[in-house]
Amino acid sequence: MALISLAIDYKKSPIEVRSEFALSGLDVSMLYRSILAIDNVVHAVILSTCNRTEVYLEISDLRVVDDILVWWQGYVRNPNYKIKDYFKLRQGTEVIMHLMKLACGLESMVLGEPQILGQVKDSYTLSKKNHAIGKELDRVFQKVFATAKRVRSETRIGYCPVSVAFSAITLAKRQLDNICSKNVLIIGAGQTGELLFRHVTALAPKQIMLANRTIEKAQKITSAFRNASAHYLSELPQLIKKADIIIAAVNVSEYIVTCKDVGDKPRVFIDISIPQALDPKLGELEQNVYYCVDDINAVIEDNKDKRKYESSKAQKIIVKSLEEYLEKEKAIISNSAIKELFQKADGLVDLSLEKSLAKIRNGKDAEEIIKRFAYEIKKKVLHYPVVGMKEASKQGRSDCLVCMKRMFGLNVEK
């Protein structure tokens, strides 16, 4: 079984590309059913956020990568975007190292941001719910979560965390002098939407309107605030008219706010959705300011220097954690092989022993039977090693011969 991952992220792909290849907003159960239906795909975990879409897989044949790319390409709306031009393939320990760094926030656009760990955990939970995760992949994710917890407790990588949501609010503040007199509309009440809401409330705007598909979730977030209200997405036309700042963090398949939905009133639009929820053409209107996820980079750069030292400490913890994981996996593999070896030996011995005992009970010469039993066991036990040594010799694999000699305590110098 091999461990691989296929990824499209912000480092190689701009927002319009990431939007095309995003798997968020699709039926999760359908995604898992379809990917597990591919021959040689054994287990899978699908992660899709605003900055990346990654698929972690246990496979039985590396040639299946082409089939997985075809599967992924099938969800792309614009055929001009070819996944082979953008994806990154990782294998083996590289997958585990990347996932550890990702969960610790070291691969994020905002170095050290904590939200990604929750997103990785959510993806893991959905995979389990859809019976898509196996023992090996489960052990990988459990070690990843333990590593992230240790990094958070032993470093200050998350100290005064600066998230994409926080950076978005920073951009809004730069564009509006007196935010206390402004009305803010947040579209989406998911994890990022809730984080946006918290940051916005700290700025004490005149009014915060939170719109979501299910109003109960929005009501739960806004209920403790006098200047906040919860709304259905269907109320967007009325809410847009009131809003000075519109921030979107929602999973949609098409734009939910376009130029025809807004008038001449100056507004700040910030879209951190993938795929994009606010039409980028809104920024072409003279009175508007428009930001997408990629525009947040400049704000994030200001924060990176502060976290580089803590990042190096986190890297050391991750390397140590990976070493621990690999050692444990070696033990699991060897213990499994040893158990299988003993079971094989038991099977060989039990059958011959029963036959020999039956002959002795029938009055046959016990000494002769025991000698014959020992000879048969010797032949059976050594059969596969002898075949293996002959095959290794034919192929010129002296390394295999040396290894097998060591296994049986033979002289490796001869």
Curated annotation (Swiss-Prot):
PANTHER family assigned: GLUTAMYL-TRNA REDUCTASE
Active site positions, chain numbering: C50
Function: Catalyzes the NADPH-dependent reduction of glutamyl-tRNA(Glu) to glutamate 1-semialdehyde (GSA).
Oligomeric and partner information: Homodimer.
UniProt cross-references to PROSITE patterns, sorted A to Z: GLUTR
Domain of life of the native organism: Bacteria
Additional remarks: During catalysis, the active site Cys acts as a nucleophile attacking the alpha-carbonyl group of tRNA-bound glutamate with the formation of a thioester intermediate between enzyme and glutamate, and the concomitant release of tRNA(Glu). The thioester intermediate is finally reduced by direct hydride transfer from NADPH, to form the product GSA.
Protein name: Glutamyl-tRNA reductase
GO molecular function: glutamyl-tRNA reductase activity; NADP binding
Family: Belongs to the glutamyl-tRNA reductase family.
CDD domains to which the protein is assigned, alphabetical: NAD_bind_Glutamyl_tRNA_reduct
Annotated positions for site Important for activity: H98
Residues reported in the UniProt entry to bind NADP(+): G188, A189, G190, Q191, T192, G193
Pathway: Porphyrin-containing compound metabolism; protoporphyrin-IX biosynthesis; 5-aminolevulinate from L-glutamyl-tRNA(Glu): step 1/2
Originating organism: Francisella tularensis subsp. novicida (strain U112)
Binding site for substrate: T49, C50, N51, R52, S108, E113, P114, Q115, Q119
Enzymatic class: oxidoreductase
Comment, domains: Possesses an unusual extended V-shaped dimeric structure with each monomer consisting of three distinct domains arranged along a curved 'spinal' alpha-helix. The N-terminal catalytic domain specifically recognizes the glutamate moiety of the substrate. The second domain is the NADPH-binding domain, and the third C-terminal domain is responsible for dimerization.
UniProt KW DNA damage keyword: no
Keywords: NADP, Oxidoreductase, Porphyrin biosynthesis
InterPro entries, sorted: 4pyrrol_synth_GluRdtase, 4pyrrol_synth_GluRdtase_dimer, 4pyrrol_synth_GluRdtase_N, GluRdtase_CS, GluRdtase_dimer_dom_sf, GluRdtase_N_sf, NAD(P)-bd_dom_sf, Shikm_DH/Glu-tRNA_Rdtase
